[in-house]
From Swiss-Prot:
Parts of the chain on the Cytoplasmic side: 1-23, 69-74, 152-160, 220-235, 305-360, 405-424
Functional note: Antiporter that mediates the exchange of sulfate and oxalate against chloride ions across a membrane. Stimulates anion transport activity of CFTR. May cooperate with CFTR in the regulation of chloride and bicarbonate ions fluxes required for activation of the ADCY10/PKA pathway during sperm motility and sperm capacitation. May play a role in sperm tail differentiation and motility and hence male fertility.
Keywords attached to this entry: Anion exchange, Developmental protein, Differentiation, Glycoprotein, Ion transport, Meiosis, Membrane, Spermatogenesis, Transmembrane, Transmembrane helix, Transport
Encoding gene (name): SLC26A8
Stated name of the protein: Testis anion transporter 1
Length: 727
C-alpha cells in the first residue's frame, strides 16, 4: 500500500512544527513562478494553449504526483524543452502557413474560419500526443522499465542535466533581450538558435537587459541570507518578493519591455472545456509520442535522483513513471502539452525550504487561485524578471563542467561518458542525446567488463600478505607458482581475456588440436584413462581426483620450445629444515630454490624452500609426454646453479574471492582451460571460491569446506595443505 501510495508514508511522518513554514514559503514561491511561466509557455512551445487550460492541467497533475510520486521536492508542470518537441507534431496540421511554428503570431487571421478550424485541429493533435505519451509511460512503469535508469551512472545524469540547463538558458535569451527569433527543432538546432540570436542582437531591448541584471544581482545577494526555523535553514524567498514587486510596478508604470500581455491577447479562447482526444491521428504521432515519453520520463527520473541524493533518500523510478503517466493522461483532456518535472521550479522548491510534497500541493493551489481570480494582474510582469529567476536557479547544474578535470583523473570511462552524453544532447537534441547516452552507458559497461582486471600477486617479504606485483617493488613470487586475482565476475565477455592473460603470464601459446586428436578424445575408453599415472612425489599427500572427461579442442605449449612440456610437479612437501630432508626417500633429489628478499639495516634475509623432483623419469612421467624430467633432475644436482634458480611454472592459483558470478559459457571455458593446463602438467587451483558459485554446476569433492576456507595467507605453506582442485 505504501509503495502504490507514497503520500501515506510522508503524511504519517510529517513534522508539522519543523517543516510547515518551509513548505508554505516554498509552495507560495513555486506557485507565483508557475503563473508567469504558464503565460509564456505558448511563446516557447509555439502553441497557443489557453492559460486556464494549462492551469487546470497543472493543478490536477500536481495533485496526482502528490499521491503517487516518490520524490519529495518534485514540481510537476510544463517544460518548454519537452513542449518544443511538439513542433514536429504540429507539422502534421500546419497552422497559418507555418506562422505558429516559426514564431510569427498574427491575431487578425483568427477571424478567418479556416484559420480557426486549423487552430482547433492543432490543439486536438497536441492533446492526442499527450494522451499517447501518458499511456506509454504507464506501460513503462507497469512493466518495471524504470530499472534502466539505475544502469546510468551519475556522470551521465549530470551531463544530461547540464545540457538541459544550457538549453534552458538559451531559450530565456528571448526574454532577456526582448527579441523574437524563429526557433529550430532537430539536430544542431542549438547552434541555429545561437546564430539567430546573434543576428537579432542589434534589436535587443535595453530595459529588459537592465531588469534581468537587477534580478540576477538580487538573487545572488540572497544566497548569503539564511533563515533558521527550528534549526532548519530556509533560504529567503527572494523570488516571491521579486515577482510581486515587479508585477505591482508593471501595473503602475508602463515599461518599454516585453510582457505576456501581447501573447495572451492573441489566444482566441480563455478556456476550453475538457474533451476526449482525437484517436484518428494516433498512427501519425506514434514516433513523436515515444520520443516525448522517453525524454519526459528520464528527465523526471534524473531530476528526482539528483534531488534525492542531496537529501539522503531514494526514489522509486517505476512509481514515478506511473505517476507522470497518469498526469499526462489527465492533462490531455484539457488539451495541454506533455508534463514532466519542471527543472527551475523544482530547484526553487528545494532551495526555498520545501521538505515534502505538501509544498507542491500548496504551490498548485496558489497557482490555480491566482490564474482564476488574478491572472490578468500578472500580465504586466516583464518576461526578463522571470528569465532572471530561472537562470539563477539552473546555473548550479553547470558546475559539473568545471569538475571534468577531476573526473578524468578519477575515472576516464565516466569522463568519456559525460562528454558523450553532453555533446550529443547539445548537438543532436535531448531526445537523440538520451538514446545515445543509454547506448553509450551500456557499451562502456560492456567494455569495462570485457577488460576485466586480473592481477598477478606476489608475497610481501617476511609476511603472509599477497599483493599485486605492479604495486610493490620488493614483491617476491613463489617459485613455480603463479597467483592470479580475478576482480570481477567471469562471463562470456571476459573469460577469453582471462585465458589470454594466463597464457601470457605463463609463457605458453595455444595450439589447436588436429582432427585425429579430437577423434581420439571421443573414442578414448575409461580403462585407458584409469591406466594413466599422474606424476607425484612420495610424501604423505592425499590422492588426486581422477582426470575429468571434459572435451577440449586445443593444447597449450611453451612459446620457446613447443616440444617441451612443463616440469612434472603437481603435489610436493614443504620441509622446514635441512635435517628433515635427510629422511626423505632415496629416489628423490633435493632441489634448492633461493630467493633474495628485502634488505633491512644492511642485512639480507634469505628464504629457502625445498621441493622435490622425481629422479626416475620412467616412473613419474605420464604416457605420451616428452621425457624431460630426467634432464631437469640432473640439472638440479648442480649446486646454486643459475639455471636451477628458475623453476618452471607447475601451479596456477586463481583467487576467486572477488568473483560472485560465473555464467554457463564462462564455466565451460574455465573447465576447458583447467583441462588444457592439466594436460600440459600445470595444475590449476581455485582459492576463495564463494559457495554461490557452486550452484552453477561445478562438481565438488566431499571436503570442499577446506577449499572454501583456504585464504591466500596460507600460500606460503601451500605444499603442506590439502588443497584440491574442483574441476
Amino acid at each position: 500500500m505504501l509503495t502504490i501510495f507514497p503520500f501515506l508514508e510522508w503524511m504519517c511522518m510529517y513534522r508539522l512544527k519543523d517543516w510547515l513554514l518551509g513548505d508554505l514559503l516554498a509552495g507560495i514561491s513555486v506557485g507565483l513562478v508557475q503563473v508567469p511561466q504558464g503565460l509564456t509557455l505558448s511563446l516557447l512551445a509555439r502553441q497557443l494553449i489557453p492559460p486556464l487550460n494549462i492551469a487546470y492541467a497543472a493543478f490536477c497533475s500536481s495533485v496526482i504526483y502528490v499521491i503517487f510520486g516518490s520524490c519529495h521536492q518534485m514540481s510537476i508542470g510544463s517544460f518548454f524543452l519537452v513542449s518544443a518537441l511538439l513542433i514536429n507534431v504540429l507539422k502534421i496540421s500546419p497552422l497559418n502557413n507555418g506562422h505558429l511554428v516559426m514564431g510569427s503570431f498574427l491575431k487578425d487571421e483568427f477571424s478567418a474560419p479556416s484559420y480557426l478550424m486549423g487552430y482547433n485541429k492543432s490543439l486536438s493533435v497536441v492533446a492526442t500526443t499527450t494522451f499517447l505519451t501518458g499511456i506509454i509511460q504507464l506501460i513503462m512503469g507497469v512493466l518495471g522499465l524504470g530499472f534502466i535508469a539505475t544502469y546510468l551512472p551519475e556522470s551521465a545524469m549530470s551531463a544530461y542535466l547540464a545540457a538541459v540547463a544550457l538549453h534552458i538558458m538559451l531559450s530565456q535569451l528571448t526574454c532577456i533581450f526582448g527579441i523574437m527569433i524563429s526557433f529550430h527543432a532537430g539536430p544542431i538546432s542549438f547552434f541555429y538558435d545561437i546564430i539567430n540570436y546573434c543576428v537579432a542582437l542589434p534589436k535587443a531591448n535595453s530595459t529588459s537587459i537592465l531588469l534581468f541584471l537587477t534580478v540576477v544581482v538580487a538573487l545572488r545577494i540572497n544566497k548569503c541570507i539564511r533563515i533558521s526555523f527550528n534549526q532548519y535553514p530556509i533560504e529567503f524567498p527572494m523570488e516571491l518578493f521579486l515577482i510581486i514587486g515587479f508585477t505591482v510596478i508593471g501595473n503602475k508604470i508602463t515599461m518599454a519591455t516585453e510582457t505576456s500581455q501581447t501573447l495572451i491577447d492573441m489566444i482566441p479562447y480563455s478556456f476550453l472545456f475538457p474533451v476526449t482526444p482525437d484517436f484518428s491521428v494516433l498512427p501519425k504521432i506514434i514516433l513523436q509520442a515515444i520520443s516525448l515519453s522517453l525524454v519526459s520520463s528520464f528527465l523526471l527520473v534524473f531530476l528526482g535522483k539528483k534531488i534525492a541524493s542531496l537529501h539522503n533518500y531514494s526514489v522509486n523510478s517505476n512509481q514515478d513513471l506511473i505517476a507522470i503517466g497518469l498526469c499526462n493522461v489527465v492533462s490531455s483532456f484539457f488539451r495541454s502539452c506533455v508534463f514532466t518535472g519542471a527543472v527551475a521550479r523544482t530547484i526553487i522548491q528545494d532551495k526555498s525550504g520545501g521538505r515534502q510534497q505538501f509544498a507542491s500541493l500548496v504551490g498548485a493551489g496558489v497557482m490555480l487561485l491566482l490564474m482564476v481570480k488574478m491572472g490578468h494582474f500578472f500580465y504586466a510582469l516583464p518576461n526578463a524578471v522571470l528569465a532572471g529567476i530561472i537562470l539563477s536557479n539552473v546555473v548550479p547544474y553547470l558546475e559539473t563542467i568545471s569538475n571534468l578535470p577531476s573526473l578524468w583523473r578519477q575515472d576516464q570511462y565516466d569522463c568519456a561518458l559525460w562528454m558523450m552524453t553532453f555533446s550529443s544532447s547539445i548537438f543532436l537534441g535531448l531526445d537523440i542525446g538520451l538514446i545515445i547516452s543509454v547506448v553509450s552507458a551500456f557499451f562502456i559497461t560492456s567494455v569495462r567488463s570485457h577488460r576485466a582486471k586480473i592481477l598477478l600477486l606476489g608475497q610481501i617479504p617476511n609476511t603472509n600478505i599477497y599483493r599485486s606485483v605492479n604495486d610493490y617493488r620488493e614483491i617476491i613470487t613463489i617459485p613455480g607458482v603463479k597467483i592470479f586475482q580475478c576482480c570481477s565476475s567471469i562471463t562470456f565477455v571476459n573469460v577469453y581475456y582471462l585465458k589470454h592473460k594466463l597464457l601470457k603470464e605463463v609463457g605458453m601459446v595455444r595450439v589447436p588440436l588436429k582432427e585425429e586428436e579430437i577423434f581420439s578424445l571421443f573414442n578414448s575408453s575409461d580403462t585407458s584413462l584409469q591406466g594413466e599415472k599422474i606424476c607425484r612425489c612420495f610424501c604423505n599427500c592425499d590422492d588426486l581426483e581422477p582426470l575429468p572427461r571434459i572435451l577440449y579442442t586445443e593444447r597449450f605449449e611453451n612459446k620457446l620450445d613447443p616440444d617441451a612440456s612443463s616440469v612434472n610437479l603437481i603435489h610436493c612437501s614443504h620441509f622446514e629444515s635441512v635435517n628433515t630432508s635427510q629422511t626423505a626417500s632415496e629416489d628423490q633429489v633435493p632441489y634448492t630454490v633461493s630467493s633474495m628478499s628485502q634488505k633491512n639495516q644492511g642485512q639480507q634475509y634469505e628464504e629457502v624452500e625445498k621441493v622435490w623432483l622425481p629422479n626416475n623419469s620412467s616412473r613419474n612421467s605420464s604416457p605420451g609426454l616428452p621425457d624431460v624430467a630426467e634432464s631437469q633432475g640432473r640439472r638440479s644436482l648442480i649446486p646454486y646453479s643459475d639455471a636451477s634458480l628458475l623453476p618452471s611454472v607447475h601451479t596456477i592459483i586463481l583467487d576467486f574471492s572477488m568473483v560472485h558470478y560465473v555464467d554457463s559459457q564462462g564455466l565451460v571455458v574455465l573447465r576447458q582451460i583447467c583441462n588444457a593446463f592439466r594436460n600440459a602438467n600445470i595444475l590449476i587451483l581455485i582459492a576463495g571460491c564463494h559457495s554461490s558459485l557452486f550452484c552453477t554446476g561445478i562438481t565438488l569433492p566431499d571436503h570442499i569446506t577446506k577449499c572454501q576456507q583456504l585464504s591466500l595467507n596460507s600460500l606460503s605453506r601451500l605444499p603442506s595443505f590439502h588443497l584440491q582442485h574442483i574441476f
